[in-house]
């Protein structure tokens, strides 16, 4: 890449970054937080944060990259995607009418809410316990990170339930919403994330998500400022780099350490070059249609229920890894959101996907606002826990693609909804047995005086 080519790419990158950052800043000033703000920051991180890192790798370490015209296509496709997404998100689908009291779809009380977070936490802890009994601490047993996807590791399906510890702790926080509950959320979820990091063998997702939710709650409540958020972001990047070194068993120093930091940070937070590799092989792609979305559900179907279930699922990430890159190392390489749309239907699917994503984020913000307006604090805690708990799925959406997001968000909704139903059933059983006694002001006063 020549300096002239780099200069042209830099101008496009700067314009796209300023365009997205400006719209995000205006939205932040208006509402402080919503899921449009979160997705916009996530989109910036995924498709634009990596450009400066790639530039340093090219000019400082002479690392090879895709041709400049391909990198230009990546930047332009990301900028156009966001423009279509933003217009879709801001488009009002129906006229605003005065709030009319409606019969709520469901209600929650104190016992049901506490039962819900206990069940969610129980699912996570039991799953971790069973996985640990089968495999021990994989971080200290395996020689390479790719081995966690091999047949040596049993009970891999249990990892999908680990994440429900975070929604459980979110319910606990939203029931109190003070600084102590906020700090308790951070300590408990990060400790759990470190435990799963050691047990699973290097998976950092739970730590990243817990830290991100902690920061966004702090921004919403005004407990941290923007400069503190930026400082925490830098600390998070350094922390993720250190965990990556431990995961891959690397011991580096000097120029090698700087080089390793650049490419690991780029691959962790901004896999934009993966989209460049995909576009570079555009003519070799056999468009998959909506099949990757259907196939991604296969992993949630037990083999005893479907004996003939394919052992290898050809979703967009695996198609990109196996068919496009001819990489059979055992690791699936993230195609990114735009890349998954290209695998499914080529360039035509990019604006269509942007419209779909705009509607998805609009729906989550509708739920979030519903929780903000809810007068029942227990129902509000459940709604907010569900919305913030889905942040992991939004990260999957930006990094892995639309197909991975759809299957995971459906799984999340089913499990979360099942926990709600079980909590309500248990409450009904306890109440029928006479074990539930409603609190009264007189009984509370007696307890205080006693």
From Swiss-Prot:
Pathway(s) annotated for this protein in UniProt: Bacterial outer membrane biogenesis; enterobacterial common antigen biosynthesis
Stated role: Probably involved in the polymerization of enterobacterial common antigen (ECA) trisaccharide repeat units.
Alphabetically ordered keywords of this record: Cell inner membrane, Cell membrane, Membrane, Transmembrane, Transmembrane helix
Phosphoprotein listed as a keyword: no
Gene Ontology biological-process entries: enterobacterial common antigen biosynthetic process
NCBIfam families: PRK02975.1 (NF002820)
Compartments reported by the entry: Cell inner membrane
Family designation: Belongs to the WzyE family.
Membrane-spanning segments: 6-26, 37-57, 63-83, 118-138, 155-175, 181-201, 207-227, 228-248, 341-361, 378-398, 410-430
Pfam family, one: WzyE
HAMAP family named among the record's database cross-references: WzyE
Protein name, UniProt field: Probable ECA polymerase
Main localization (coarse): membrane
Key word Transmembrane helix present: yes
The protein's assembly and partners: Probably part of a complex composed of WzxE, WzyE and WzzE.
Membrane topology: Multi-pass membrane protein
GO CC field: plasma membrane
């Amino acid at each position: 890449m020549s300096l002239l080519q780099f200069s042209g790419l830099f101008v496009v990158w700067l314009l796209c970054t300023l365009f997205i950052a400006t719209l995000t800043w205006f939205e932040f000033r208006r509402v402080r937080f919503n899921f449009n703000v979160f997705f916009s920051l996530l989109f910036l991180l995924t498709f634009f944060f990596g450009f400066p890192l790639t530039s340093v790798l090219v000019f400082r370490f002479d690392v090879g990259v895709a041709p400049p015209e391909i990198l230009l296509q990546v930047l332009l496709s990301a900028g156009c995607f966001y423009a279509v997404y933003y217009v879709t998100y801001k488009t009002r689908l129906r006229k605003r009418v005065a709030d009319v009291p409606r019969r709520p779809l469901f209600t929650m009380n104190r016992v049901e809410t506490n039962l819900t977070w206990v069940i969610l936490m129980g699912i996570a802890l039991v799953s971790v316990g069973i996985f640990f009994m089968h495999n021990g601490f994989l971080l200290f047993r395996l020689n390479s990170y790719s081995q966690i996807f091999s047949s040596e590791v049993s009970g891999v399906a249990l990892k999908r339930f680990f994440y429900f510890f975070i929604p459980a702790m979110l319910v606990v926080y939203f029931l109190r919403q003070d600084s102590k509950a906020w700090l308790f959320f951070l300590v408990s979820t990060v400790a759990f994330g470190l435990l799963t990091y050691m047990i699973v063998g290097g998976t950092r997702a739970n730590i990243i998500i817990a830290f991100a939710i902690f920061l966004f709650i702090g921004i919403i409540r005004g407990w941290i400022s923007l400069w503190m958020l930026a400082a925490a972001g830098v600390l998070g990047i350094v922390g993720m780099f250190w965990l990556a070194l431990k995961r891959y068993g690397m011991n580096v120093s000097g120029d090698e350490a700087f080089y390793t930091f650049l490419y690991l940070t780029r691959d962790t937070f901004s896999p934009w070059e993966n989209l460049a590799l995909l576009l570079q092989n555009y003519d070799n792609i056999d468009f998959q249609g909506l099949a990757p979305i259907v196939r991604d559900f296969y992993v949630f179907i037990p083999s005893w229920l479907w004996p003939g279930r394919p052992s290898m699922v050809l979703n967009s990430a695996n198609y990109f890894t196996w068919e496009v890159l001819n990489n059979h190392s055992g690791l699936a390489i993230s195609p990114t959101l735009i890349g998954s749309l290209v695998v499914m239907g080529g360039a035509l699917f990019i604006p269509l996907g942007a419209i779909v994503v705009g509607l998805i984020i609009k729906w989550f913000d509708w739920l979030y606002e519903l929780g903000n307006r809810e007068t029942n604090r227990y129902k509000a805690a459940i709604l907010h826990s569900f919305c913030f708990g889905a942040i992991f799925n939004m990260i999957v959406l930006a990094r892995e693609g639309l197909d991975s997001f759809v299957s995971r968000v459906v799984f999340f909704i089913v499990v979360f909804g099942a926990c709600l139903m079980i909590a309500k059933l248990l409450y009904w059983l306890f109440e029928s047995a006479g074990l539930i006694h409603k609190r009264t002001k007189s009984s509370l006063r007696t307890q205080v005086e006693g």
